[in-house]
């Protein structure tokens, strides 16, 4: 039976991948778990343990071949794949996400943006035209949609998620400050948490 990979491990794989990318660009051919750990500020035993979920990568004494490990991680976390993304809510956050070119560079293609407010329908945001949320069924029939960004007010969030789940969405990046009830993977984004964490570090003089 396949080992269940804990969510925190999956999250860290993305960090490892970015770190390896940088190491590779710096021309570092082999890397020890200690080096990855130091760069990311975590324990090297943690790095070794996380990577061991996916089989034996490194060689004792030599470490990991940077490029090979990067390629293996690409396969595991699906970086080689393009993901189709839609944004629900064409307000401040939704518009910013739909306009963000960096996502496409990371292979997350925003292919649609939807809103319930008719006055926003037809507006151009980046390369996209805002569609009414009632057009979502039709959109799913014509497109493969894997990820949705939820940028609607708190009170609309659950209703939107229920609909997206019914249509077969695979995962959600949620900006609404609410715990969603769903069986699909959700990544909550909370900017206030970053501020709280920063103020905590400042107060305790932590770098
Ligand atoms: N996570 C964070 O760090 C963070 C930061 C700021 C705001 N937020 C949250 O993100 C969400 C969006 O914030 P914003 O500033 O972009 O709000 P906004 O009011 O600018 O935009 C929300 C949009 O959602 C649309 N909408 C409402 N109900 C809808 C529905 N049922 N279907 C489709 N569209 C619908 C509205 O018409 C509006 O255009 C809010 O829940 C807000 O609390 C989160």
UniProtKB/Swiss-Prot annotation:
DNA-binding region: 15-54
Gene Ontology biological process: negative regulation of DNA-templated transcription; response to redox state
Pfam name, any one: Put_DNA-bind_N
Record-listed NAD(+) binding positions: 89-94
Top-rank lineage group of the source organism: Bacteria
Gene3D superfamilies according to UniProt: NAD(P)-binding Rossmann-like Domain, Winged helix-like DNA-binding domain superfamily/Winged helix DNA-binding domain
SUPFAM superfamilies in the record: NAD(P)-binding Rossmann-fold domains, Winged helix' DNA-binding domain
Keyword terms of this UniProt record: Cytoplasm, DNA-binding, NAD, Repressor, Transcription, Transcription regulation
Record's keyword annotation contains NAD: yes
Chief location of this protein within or outside the cell: cytoplasm
InterPro entries from the UniProt entry: CoA-bd (IPR003781), NAD(P)-bd_dom_sf (IPR036291), Rex_DNA-bd_C_dom (IPR009718), Tscrpt_rep_Rex (IPR022876), WH-like_DNA-bd_sf (IPR036388), WH_DNA-bd_sf (IPR036390)
Entry's localization field: Cytoplasm
A Gene Ontology cellular-component term: cytoplasm
Gene Ontology MF terms: DNA binding; DNA-binding transcription factor activity
Matching PANTHER family: REDOX-SENSING TRANSCRIPTIONAL REPRESSOR REX, REDOX-SENSING TRANSCRIPTIONAL REPRESSOR REX 1
Sequence similarity: Belongs to the transcriptional regulatory Rex family.
Quaternary context: Homodimer.
Function per UniProt: Modulates transcription in response to changes in cellular NADH/NAD(+) redox state.
Protein name (Swiss-Prot/TrEMBL): Redox-sensing transcriptional repressor Rex
Species, as recorded: Thermosipho africanus (strain TCF52B)
Originating gene: rex
